[in-house]
Amino acid sequence: LQFLYNMHERNELVERVYAFTDESGAFGWDIENPNVSTHFIITAIIVKEPDLEGFTQKAEALRKKHFQTGEIKSSNIGGNHARRLRVLADLQGIPFSIFSVCVDKKKCIENMSMKGLQYKKTFYKFMNNIVHRELRRAFEKITIVADEIGGNEYMQSFCQYVTSHQDMPNLFGDAKFSFENSKNDVRIQMAD
């Protein structure tokens, strides 16, 4: 019983973190086409639970200041580098960390030994699972909230994929995963 009590006590001391994820770059292998991205990036904005409320309030203030009624989206800034620098400067006071995985699709093409990656759904699942696996390894108590991708059926299959490809569960681990629409969640917009 002492061991179980110590386990519970330890779990209470471990701080929960939240990771809000979004992707940049699209699926597609015709990278010579200027409309097809050469890289695929998945970013997680990581926030400690005690900072979550302040993070959300400050992110919403940043959204209102720089994007008015729209979403925080890098594509809305485009090539306006002065505006991008103003947004980045205002990120300074917001409590969060960043974890990103950047995939050079040229390297994937050169090493296309995993034939399944040529299919869109498989590609998205595989790439997102890399991020999710690393986050679960780094944080014992984590809630991952990803931007919705595809339809409901795809998101359900993605959740099953993540669950079936996770490492062996650890006694102290507590990982949760869900999808939210970034249009309704400024926290996910911050990952854009």
Locations of regions flagged by a protein language model:
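Phosphate-ester processing/binding pockets and catalytic centers
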Residues: 1-192
